[in-house]
């Protein structure tokens, strides 16, 4: 039996389009960029050498409605991967060939890693690229949206588990923590690592920097919405 009131589905669709339209418009304007990213960057951060040639890579920041709130799918990377094993990340990877766009690569990786069909995703913009010294990549985050929660299917060897992360948590008080770690390759060089908490999993590094910029954009949209009331 359908317990939804008449027009509920239409109202939900209108709310979805309203948010997406405002987000698309904000992504077409100057982005928060490095200033926002650095709020979640390890300190001191490992930057690539000035003359380093970074290989292009892409990641999909996908937003979808679930349980009455917007969510982002994040993956805990499998233990057999070459880089960033066990870390929380967005679905993504390097471009397969020179003719592949970052949008195509992001959609392909999301399909391979978490089973999201590319034809269900509406690409609405890009965030600021993040250079990653450890893997030698320049990561281009791509923002996409789907109307409904995807039927996720995880790649067994690449993804240990899926985290459905609420967008609202990015701007909640107390969302950010930090810890100290010894910097890789040094005996005493300590880094302060900021992180978002995701049900006990810590989101740090490049993924946290991407989410920090997205959080700044969400904050802008929230402020604009309050100003219109």
What do the PLM-derived regions correspond to, one by one?
Residues 1-89, 94-112, 116-140, 145-149, ...:
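N-terminal leader/linker segments that precede catalytic domains of diphosphate-processing enzymes
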Residues 154-184, 188-197:
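NUDIX/MutT-family hydrolases
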